[in-house]
UniProtKB/Swiss-Prot annotation:
It comes from Salmonella typhi. One of its GO terms (molecular function) is LPPG:FO 2-phospho-L-lactate transferase activity. Belongs to the gluconeogenesis factor family. Keywords: Cytoplasm. Required for morphogenesis under gluconeogenic growth conditions. GO terms for biological process: regulation of cell shape. Its main location: cytoplasm. This is Putative gluconeogenesis factor. SUPFAM superfamilies: CofD-like. It is found in: Cytoplasm. GO terms for cellular component: cytoplasm.
Length: 302
């Protein structure tokens, strides 16, 4: 079908984590419940890492970030959810949203139930699904063959790892697999390459679903240089090759990137190269500009 718009689609699925996924979801929030985010759950730093070390469970920080960016009706509940403790006490640095999600996780049968309770409280229409409902961490093999455990340590590597994997081996959330199966459009990125994007692709069931889906797939590149040293050295072609290596098939049809990205070696896919930067924070995507670029990509794909 020609001239489809995002509003015509029944199911749009975005994968990733951190600020990047939240930005994509907020730029497409007009889709309401037709929009689904599959969220990385391997963070082990900051408030999230402290909660995991103390209480166990999945990482809630990326999920909280997505929920924060999807709030459209400010309320007492949203102010509480976004509150971060200051000072020097035991709660210093903790985000109340992380603690609320963890508390509801304790009160629920499944983490997904906790997320849906918070979504209803915050009046968030988009569906949000953790990539797995079991605790899992990212692990890498560095260029010396050493095992490097956890996102925080992997981001501090001087060179790209030889291999990345999840530990332990956990199943994907079944609703995440079903969302990919039902998708009309799939988006990957932006976000920290190794620690926000790759974890979802390392789950066997999600990789298999991405191999099988007929839905067009779009990779959204970062704006500016990554803070993670190993990821900062990767080119656009490197990233596309690595994602598809772990997925197991050439599946990415389109890349959406800013004007400073070298796309000269990307000759086998559609490239949408536009100004995407937000005026207030240059390395963040402007919601409307990103929305427009995705519309252009969808129409070019036909």
């Amino acid at each position: 079908m020609r001239n489809r718009t995002l509003a015509d689609l029944d199911r749009v699925v975005a994968l990733g984590g951190g600020h990047g996924l939240g930005r994509v979801l907020s730029s497409l929030s007009s889709l309401g419940s037709r929009l689904t985010g599959i969220v990385t759950t391997t963070d082990n730093g900051g408030s999230t890492g402290r909660i995991r070390r103390s209480e166990g469970g999945i990482a809630w920080g990326d999920m909280r970030n997505c929920l924060n960016q999807l709030i459209t009706e400010p309320s007492v509940a949203s102010a509480m959810f976004e509150y971060r403790f200051g000072g020097n006490g035991e709660l210093s640095g903790h985000n109340l949203g992380n603690l609320m999600l963890k508390a509801l996780d304790h009160l629920s049968v499944r983490p997904l139930e906790a997320i849906n309770l918070i979504r209803n409280l915050l009046k968030v229409d988009a569906q949000l699904i953790p990539m797995s409902e079991l605790p899992v961490d990212l692990m890498a093999i560095d260029d010396q063959g050493h095992e490097i455990y956890g996102e925080v340590n992997i981001d501090q590597l001087a060179t790209p790892p030889q291999e990345i994997m999840l530990t332990p081996n956990v199943p994907a959330t079944r609703e995440a697999v079903q969302a990919i199966n039902d998708a009309d459009l799939i988006l990957i990125g932006p976000g920290s390459f190794y620690t926000s994007l790759m974890p979802c692709l390392l789950l066997d069931e999600l990789a298999q679903a991405l191999r099988r889906t007929p839905a067009p797939m779009v990779y959204i590149g970062n704006l500016g240089r990554e803070l993670s040293l190993p990821a900062a050295s990767l080119t656009l072609v490197d990233k596309l090759a690595m994602m598809e290596q772990y997925i197991g098939k050439k599946v990415i049809d389109t890349v959406v990137v800013g004007p400073r990205v070298d796309v000269s070696a990307v000759n086998d896919r559609l490239v949408i190269q536009e100004v995407l930067e937000a005026s207030d924070i240059p390395y963040r995507h402007d919601r409307q500009l990103l929305h427009n670029a995705l519309e252009k990509a969808l129409q070019a794909l036909g």
